[in-house]
Amino acid sequence: MEDVLDVYELPYNPQRPVVCMDEKPYQLLGEARSPLPMRPGNDQKVDSEYVRNGTCSIFAFVEPLGGAHHVSVREHRTAIDWAEEIKYLADVMYPDVEKIILVMDNLNTHKPASLYKRYPCSAIIPADEARRIMKRLEIHYTPKHGSWLDIAEIELNVMTRQCLNRRIDNISNLRKELSAWEVERNTVAAKVNWQFRTVLLPQVQKQLLFRNSAQKLTNWKN
């Protein structure tokens, strides 16, 4: 936990941007019946029944101090998908920086091995492509059960409230909606003012220790 908090306390450096990454599944939902249109004095009426149109995955990147944002939609959440997103991060979003300081959770696909799986040595792909991408990164993982430390999780929550508070029935429409949302976020360069600091950690740890001890005592009495 201290490692991630120390990263968040680093001063802004455009040559060493701190970027947070996260992903979430999304359920594509269609209307079982056509909604009744809005009328004067009445909101649009939407039936409670819906049609499941499968799932997809949303990947999000946010630079808290620089205000850069990127979201993408993929049909799956595999090592290949993650590797391609990381290549986009390195080669399109930050092609000229010295190092990208990347914060993310410790998901099984969020590993250097995923890059080597996607970009193996071949006649088409250079032998050192995966290594080249990895050398651009300085990775910091959030601890187990500590995904709340990933600022990209906050970004996904904001995105859900602002853009995904209605049914979207297919990937094409979802991509259009999120693309428009991304443009807006980048236009205003929305930044994140992270307040939780390393100096507050002992107090939080003490509270967690007290809570766990109280829970164990309750379980023992029961």
Protein language model regions, located:
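Mobile genetic element proteins and their domesticated derivatives, centered on retroelements
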Residues: C20-D22, F61, I86, D105, ...
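RNase H-like two-metal-ion nuclease catalytic core shared by retroviral integrases
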Residues: C56, D105-N106, M134-R161
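Short, basic/hydrophobic alpha-helical segments
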Residues: I80-I101
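Short mixed-charge
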Residues: Y119-R136
